[in-house]
From Swiss-Prot:
SUPFAM superfamilies: Ribosomal L11/L12e N-terminal domain (SSF54747), Ribosomal protein L11, C-terminal domain (SSF46906). SMART domains: RL11. Keywords: Ribonucleoprotein, Ribosomal protein, RNA-binding, rRNA-binding. One of its GO terms (cellular component) is large ribosomal subunit. This is Large ribosomal subunit protein uL11. GO terms for biological process: translation. Pfam families: Ribosomal_L11 (PF00298), Ribosomal_L11_N (PF03946). Forms part of the ribosomal stalk which helps the ribosome interact with GTP-bound translation factors. Disulfide bonds: none annotated. Belongs to the universal ribosomal protein uL11 family.
Length: 157
């Protein structure tokens, strides 16, 4: 029988303590080995919370599947901010460039159900809106409308 453990760990900095240790200890795995493998797999996402699936097989072997951090975490890393606005809509805490927006959308596209980059960009803009982030000085709602009307082109890759 295969067991799956899902945890959210800091990229490249997982430790044997909670949430990891208590989740995998009872399964009979070498916790240090699992932690080392997770840290190796998540080192590119240092400073971000990363969803990780640990797939444990009957013979106590395991596989690690690394997910993509939430869009909000990618935005915060791109802007170098700690948190979004406490009063989005009235408060602006950062401004992304169009290139930064496209980079975040490209990263998230691997996990999104949307078919086109344009649709993923609109998903990211929704998160920007709820965090108090503008793009090129424009509100995310305004930019979404401009994309819909064809005033702003999103390249297809």
């Amino acid at each position: 029988m295969v067991q799956v453990v899902e945890v959210l760990v800091p990229g490249g900095q997982a430790s044997p303590g909670p949430p990891l240790g208590p989740a995998i200890g009872p399964l009979g795995l070498n916790v240090k080995q699992v932690v080392d493998k997770i840290n190796e797999a998540t080192k590119d996402y240092e400073g971000l919370s990363v969803p990780v699936k640990i797939i444990v097989k009957d013979d106590r072997s395991f596989e690690i599947e690394v997910g993509i951090p939430p869009v909000s975490a990618l935005i915060k890393r791109e802007l170098g901010i700690e948190k979004g606005a406490s009063n989005p809509g009235r408060e602006v805490v950062g401004n992304l460039t169009m290139e930064q927006l496209l980079n975040i959308a490209r990263i998230k596209r691997q996990q999104s159900l949307s078919y086109t980059l344009k649709e993923v960009v609109k998903e990211v803009l929704g998160t920007c809106n709820s965090m108090g982030i503008t793009v090129e000085g424009k509100s995310p709602k305004e930019l979404t409308r401009m994309i819909e009307e064809g005033q702003v082109e999103i390249p297809e890759e």
